[in-house]
Regions:
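Non-catalytic terminal/accessory segments
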Residues: 1-410
């Protein structure tokens, strides 16, 4: 329990329906742990409902999270610590999500290797609202394969059915294992391990990260057969539905996996998926909107750079540099656009451009050209006034430079 407590305190996070924070957890345990422990051992402990939070999904719609109370988070973390070693050794080598020492990077590299080996068609399967649609009986039957303690089985089921509070009302839950608690990722892997074992038994090459599963085959016809048969397996065995609108049998370079895509060449180089670029641009625009009126250097240091650095770190596996060069240029243009807007009057623009080294004639022509901020931010006069080095001196990082730090010298 002490290890679970340390993990909960380290991860912090928002409070549940009781409003208690992780900083208040130790004091609560000092007062109430004896009673809580007794009810756990007696098999009578009743979790509180989770707090519902809806967050936007990158492709539209929302993802539903269920935030447990900090006490329930502690108990779930302890359960996770006990169950994880029991299952971990039996999980598939092709499963990468929510597992110790594994992650998205390994999954992406494994997917690339499958394509490079000649499997140049992908069965891209999207499970419809997976975390909201998990059948409790099917899941608990899988858990019971390795857990015989009826108290623990009952406690896990009560967590699954603990209800969800939204707008002051508690909704009963008959299905799903909402994301937000420590147990949910492990339970999802326990359920989908049946899928992994089925794919392995059939000899399929696949990569699965949580509910994101790609199967690699050598022809469209083979992919269509796999899509149909695996969809039937999921429906009949696990009572899960494949989202046909978001699933497809397609070339890997026309799909994305964990934010990445591939080039169509034989080498199948990793690249940033188009949608991932769009999402970054949307986030950058949000930062610019929230940072309007702030000192530019402070905005770059505190708001822009952390976002760019995290994005570059994740996509450092990309083997094509063009997208990073294009984004670097686009970000500088956004900054030039901000500065042009700040110079509201033509006379101010003229004076600033002169100070930045433009000739009198060129500064006048630019200041009174009547064009909009975005056009001017891409025009030569502002590129001369604000070259890349100007923003570098303000502390702006380069996405290309950041990712190149991870690239091996050729």
């Amino acid at each position: 329990m002490f290890r679970a407590l340390a993990a909960v305190e380290r991860n912090a996070g928002a409070g549940g329906v009781d409003g208690r924070s992780t900083r208040q957890l130790r004091a609560h345990l000092h007062q109430h742990w004896t009673q809580t422990k007794a009810s756990l051992l007696a098999g009578t402990y009743q979790p509180l409902p989770v707090r519902r939070v809806d967050i936007p999904k990158p492709g539209g719609g929302t993802r539903m999270l269920g935030i447990p109370t900090v006490l329930d988070r502690l108990i779930q973390q302890a359960i996770h610590q006990v169950l994880c070693p029991i299952w971990e050794g039996d999980f598939s080598e092709s499963s990468y999500g929510f597992r110790p020492g594994r992650g998205a990077r390994q999954a992406v590299k494994a997917a690339q290797q499958q394509v490079q080996s000649g499997k140049r068609w992908v069965v891209d399967m999207d499970l419809e609202k997976f975390f909201d649609r998990v059948n409790h009986d099917v899941l608990m039957a899988r858990v019971a394969r390795k857990v015989q303690d009826k108290r623990l089985l009952g406690l896990i089921r009560r967590y699954l059915q603990s209800g969800m509070m939204a707008g002051g009302m508690v909704e009963a839950r008959s299905e799903g294992t909402p994301q937000g608690g420590p147990m949910s990722p492990l339970l999802s892997n326990i359920l989908l391990d049946d899928l992994d074992k089925e794919l392995e038994a059939r000899g399929h090459a696949f990569c699965r990260y949580a509910d994101d599963c790609n199967i690699y085959v050598r022809s469209r016809r083979a992919g269509q057969r796999v899509m149909a048969s695996v969809s039937r397996f999921l429906r009949k065995r696990l009572r899960l539905k494949v989202n046909e609108a978001k699933s497809a049998v397609e070339r890997p370079w026309k799909r994305k996996f964990l934010g990445y895509s591939l080039t169509h060449h034989q080498a199948a180089k990793l690249k940033v998926a188009v949608e991932s670029v769009r999402r970054l641009k949307d986030k950058v625009k949000e930062r610019f909107g929230a940072g309007r009126g702030r000192n530019l250097g402070t905005f770059i240091r505190d708001d822009l750079n952390p976002l760019l650095r995290g994005w570059a770190n994740y996509f450092a596996l990309s083997e094509t540099k063009g997208v990073f060069e294009e984004l670097d240029g686009w970000i500088r243009r956004k900054l030039r656009c901000v500065q042009w807007r700040q110079w509201k009057r033509p006379w101010t623009r003229y004076q600033r451009l002169r100070k930045l080294g433009l000739t009198d004639g060129r500064a006048r022509e630019s200041a009174w050209n009547g064009r909009g901020p975005w056009w001017n931010s891409g025009a030569s006069h502002l590129n001369v006034a604000f070259p890349a080095g100007y923003y570098q001196r303000l502390g702006l990082i380069s996405l290309l430079t950041e990712v190149q730090r991870f690239w091996k010298p050729t």
